[in-house]
Curated annotation (Swiss-Prot):
InterPro entries for this protein: IMPase, Inositol_monoP_metal-BS, Inositol_monoPase_Li-sen, Inositol_monophosphatase-like, Inositol_monophosphatase_CS
Cofactor: Mg(2+)
Induction: Up-regulated by light and down-regulated by Li(+).
UniProt GO MF annotations: inositol monophosphate 1-phosphatase activity; inositol monophosphate phosphatase activity; magnesium ion binding
Name under which the protein is recorded: Inositol monophosphatase 1
Residues annotated to bind Mg(2+) 2: 91, 94, 221
Cysteines engaged in disulfide bonds, as pairs: none
One GO BP annotation of this record: signal transduction
Superkingdom assignment: Eukaryota
Enzyme class: hydrolase
Length: 273
């Protein structure tokens, strides 16, 4: 049950925050970026920090009793505590590497969990002005129009999305590429857009039939898109086929017709060389 407001109110405030942050992203997209390396290939910019501050300040003004988890604050400390309390989970710039390179797949992702369940989701792509929204039990929308997952039922006719992450040790790279190589024999083609949140939304609106990612950064990568996928009629689960856990850094999404075949293909891809 919502606390300190209705779910519609939560969504409205989150949309406002996402659009304000999106304006910062849009203005900075073609400018010179001041980049800091979080790891070998993981980047953060001044825009990430400015957007997270803006979003949290806006949300805290409206919902001061809520909890807050953000990529730039939580990832930096390696510490976040997801409780049953209403918790806003934010990735201020999902697709920072794209942003740095001027590659137009960048978004703001804002999710609200209540009882650890993704309940409200907002994903805003300011470069092409696409706003994905969802409320648990009330549908998913793209720029105010209802969206649904693809009705495709054949794996071989399906478009698969994934990402390669930012870890570059030999074992991770070998495992990732082996998995992709094996899956390519099962699907029509593969896409990597560089944003987990957008990948999930593209499943929700039918642009992708399949998506999986193993080893993403944290709950901020999926909190916004998770409820949007479910409300669009999709299914969200662990790549092993078990129940999705927002804190596990493992996610897969598709439509109900493809889930069984997709899980089988994912499992086989782990062992076939």
């Amino acid at each position: 049950m919502a606390r300190n407001g209705s779910l519609e109110e939560f969504l409205g405030v989150a949309v406002d925050a996402a659009k304000r942050a999106g304006e910062i992203i849009r203005k900075g997209f073609h400018e010179t970026k001041h980049v800091v390396h979080k790891g070998q290939v993981d980047l953060v910019t001044e825009t990430d920090k400015a957007c997270e501050d803006l979003i949290f300040n806006h949300l805290k003004q409206h919902f001061p009793s809520h909890k807050f988890i953000g990529e730039e604050t939580s990832a930096a400390t390696g510490d976040f505590d997801l409780t049953d309390e209403p918790t806003w989970i934010v990735d201020p710039v999902d697709g920072t590497t794209n942003f740095v390179h001027g590659f137009p797949s960048v978004c703001v992702s804002i999710g609200l969990t209540i009882g650890k369940i993704p309940t409200v989701g907002v994903v805003y792509d300011p470069i092409i002005d696409e706003l994905f929204t969802g409320i648990n039990g009330k549908g998913a929308y793209l720029n105010g129009k209802p969206i649904k997952v693809s009705s495709q039922s054949e794996l071989v006719k399906s478009l698969l999305g994934t990402e390669v992450g930012t870890t570059r040790d030999n074992l991770t790279v070998e495992t990732t590429t082996r998995r992709i190589n094996n899956l390519l024999f099962k699907v029509r083609s593969l896409r990597m857009c560089g944003s987990c949140a957008l990948d999930l939304c593209w499943v929700a609106c039918g642009r992708l039939e399949l998506f999986y990612l193993i080893g993403y950064g944290g709950p901020w990568d999926v909190a916004g898109g998770a409820v949007i996928v479910k409300e669009a009629g999709g299914v969200l689960f662990d790549p092993s086929g078990s129940e999705f856990d927002i804190t596990s850094q493992r996610v897969a999404a598709t439509n109900p017709h493809l889930k069984e075949a997709f899980v089988e293909a994912l499992q086989l891809s782990e062992y076939v060389s």
